[in-house]
Amino acid sequence: MSRGLGDVYKRQTVYFGGGTPSVLGADRLCDILDFIKFNFNIQNNAEITVEVNPDSAKTIDFEKMYACGFNRISMGMQTAVEDELRLLGRIHSIDDAKTSVERAKSAGFNNISLDLMMGIPNQTIESLEKSISFCADCKVTHISSYILKIEENTPFYKVQNKLKLADDDMQAEMYLKAVEMLDSLGYKQYEISNFAKQGYESRHNTNYWRCGEYIGIGPSAHSFFEGKRFFYSRSMDDFNNNKLSFEGTGGDEEEFIMLSLRLKSGLNYYEFEEKFGYTLPSYIIKKAKEYEKYGYTNVTDKSISFTPKGFLVSNSIISELI
């Protein structure tokens, strides 16, 4: 793959994710990054992110990682309330998270993101506010805040009937409170679940939401390139043998509309026309306009976008638009 793409396409971002790459340690992570830089055309000011969890980050050599080229940290903290961490099955403490952020900053990292979760069993508005305040006190530049989803084959799924889970109304209240509080602290919403200080929006994830191309490397990694979607299975043997599975095409009008509307800036009419060669159908604009009276959408002569309240029902509205 690197032989076919390395010299042709200049890569603007590199992202180490898909689990907990920090368990590899700084030496191996830097070796992999060096390999990527050697085989791919990575631009000089590329955003290079690595996901870490607060437990493995206690001992990782942040200085070495910063020196070899990593410049952004994404940390899966989830909550700043110890009881909620235990419910989630996380083994780190709040002190671990704080120490890890401080160590990363001391090493030179000034672009750090923390993940928060809403709708945790027994979580309250007050405990959510505590978690948000903790992130702000850490002076990180980016916060992602997601609503808990109960997936099959997870510990929560098996015992969900015994848990006090937030209902839809409580989840909505938490989401709107998070948006309001984060905004007051200088974290501006730029995507349905993502908030950043000015200039620190995730370039890597924004590329996904703008239907940009990306190459995924490793078991279970997905790619979108030259209009085609493909992926590696979970099998290490398949990956070692470069056995790819194809999902079909991507980047069509419906996908562009759906992904653009995840962004706070919304669906830009000019960008749609530039990409597809014709103007956005007027019925889409007209339909989106109908939801303005409910406080769900903002429709101008340039774009359609969702309000924070609208993001809560965006899936159903988008299904009507496309």
Where are these regions (language model features)?
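Hydrophobic, secondary-structure "cap" segments at the distal end of domains
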Residues: 206-292, 298
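Single conserved hydrophobic/aromatic residue that forms the stacking wall/gate
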Residues: 1-9
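Glycine-rich anion/phosphate-binding loops
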Residues: 54-60, 126
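Minor-groove-contacting beta-hairpin "wing" of winged helix-turn-helix DNA-binding domains
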Residues: 303-307
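Short, amphipathic alpha-helical interaction segments positioned at domain boundaries
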Residues: 309-322
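Conserved C-terminal portion of the radical SAM core fold
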Residues: 67-77, 95-161, 168-198, 211, ...
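Core AdoMet radical
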Residues: 10-23, 42-55, 71-80, 84-96, ...
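Nucleotide and nucleotide-moiety/phosphate-recognizing core
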Residues: 6-7, 25-31, 35-45
